Amino acid sequence: MIVRMQHLDLVCVASDREATLEKLRALGAVHLDLAAAGGAAVTAAKGELDDAEKAVRLIRKARGKDFADEVRPCSVADVLALDDDRATLVAEKERLEREIKTYEPYGDFDPVLAKKLLDRGIDLADELPAKLPAMRLGKMREKLARVVNRIAVDDAKTARADEQAILAKYPALRDKMAFEQAKELMSEQGAVAVVSGWIPVSRVSGLTSSARDCGWGLLLRDPAEGETPPTLIEPPKFVRPVKVLFEGLGIAPAYDEADVSVPFMCYFSLFFAMLVGDGGYGAIILALTLFGWRKHLRASSKAQGKGQVVVVRSWLVLMTVFSLATIAWGALSNTWFGAGLPWCADWPTVKWLGDPSYKNMMFLCFTIGVSHLMFARIWNGISAINDRRCLGQFAWAGILFFMYWITNTIVGIFTGGIPVWLYVVFGVSFVTVFLQSKGIEKGMLFLNVMSTLGDVISYVRLFAVGLASVKVAENFNNMALSIFSCTDLIWVKPLLAVGMILVLLIGHGLNFAMAGLSILVHAVRLNTLEFSNHKGISWAGYAFRPFKTAKE
């Protein structure tokens, strides 16, 4: 569900504003619009955080992949100073390289001696450049070598800087910036200071108790028309990890919209499995996830913020669910790294999904699609059951079912034509929607009805992308086998085996990466566009982020 919010105005004595903010932060229940805060103190605090992040990037860049030296304490300022020195040296290096390239054709001559000869009137126009260098070529090369060596020394010092010590300062720096932002939001009006924000209804009692103890004044009210409270989603426990997926995608339903966490999680898992389409890939994802679980369980006992632990654990739960769903799909379709297991070939699901005409797979995709979209419309209807508008939502479900039948008829899955009763369902549904439409909605009704056909057909992407993934894997398997079997010479076989393994690794690696990309494109789209359009989810909200310390 989406938690109800109340708007609050908190009043305190102006001289106690910092202490008030400290207690408000300790409470960890109030959302403040920190992004709207500015000012010199905020800029300075943000600059400190940016400097720390830049220092970490510089250290990682200097280390590369094979760093194994002992780290040494080094402040952020020291790392940035090394970078500034390096930038100056790089500019000097580039200048010297340009000069060497310019004067190299003239050889290693002494510019002082050349000037003396020119001053005596000796014509050396063909042998000397128009402008004499400041030093001879050999000296330039020596200086360039010294500059290159100093750059290497700076890089080595940067690489040995203690990255973890800087990372450990991140929470405190973030807290400092958030606190300065909160101070800027807290306006002073004479002897009092006022700050406004949002608080979940369930946390109001804790705030009022603190207000009594601290002598604050509180004004609490429900959101006014036109206000946009933050969205705090509290889904059922078994799908709670989906919240990190929403955060990762940067989406949140608006405050007055529905919480679609349960259908999003269920259908996204199904889409993930069908788009990857290979149980072998699912096994790899599961193995990587189990490795992640092992590292997480070891690391969670160390000094780490509770919020960070929850985020990592939620992602691991999600990947466990997605990988198991993919393995299950691989078992149902008998697809393992683009090949099938002989002893599974006669399973009913394998035969049904493996129909050479692909009609069964398309039928499954269209059925999943119409169930997804009809679920959205029926949910809307049930939510508005005490309002006559619910009839319009149920009517849209009828239109979707009619389009589903048409889609299956177009591709030859249903061969008996469209039954008369379905025309009646469509007619009644269309008239119901028409009568409930107003203004421009009536003018757009025909296009909206036709777009439902496109929405249902859109789910065929689950079949098309999944099939493409399987075919790519099959082709790389065949390519690898053809390389290994191209000759019967025994002494060549080891080399051919290496080539076969390389082809398999590269081919399946690329296919695995493309499967990940297809999830970001297609699985996300079907949930956030097709389904959300029918459910009425705009994803125009912003997440509830309470003012609290970064370690919480």
Stretches found by the model and what they are:
Residues 1-264, 292, 313-319:
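Long, charged N-terminal accessory/stalk domains
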Residues 1-6, 18-32, 202-552:
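Conserved, carboxylate-rich catalytic/transport cores that coordinate ions
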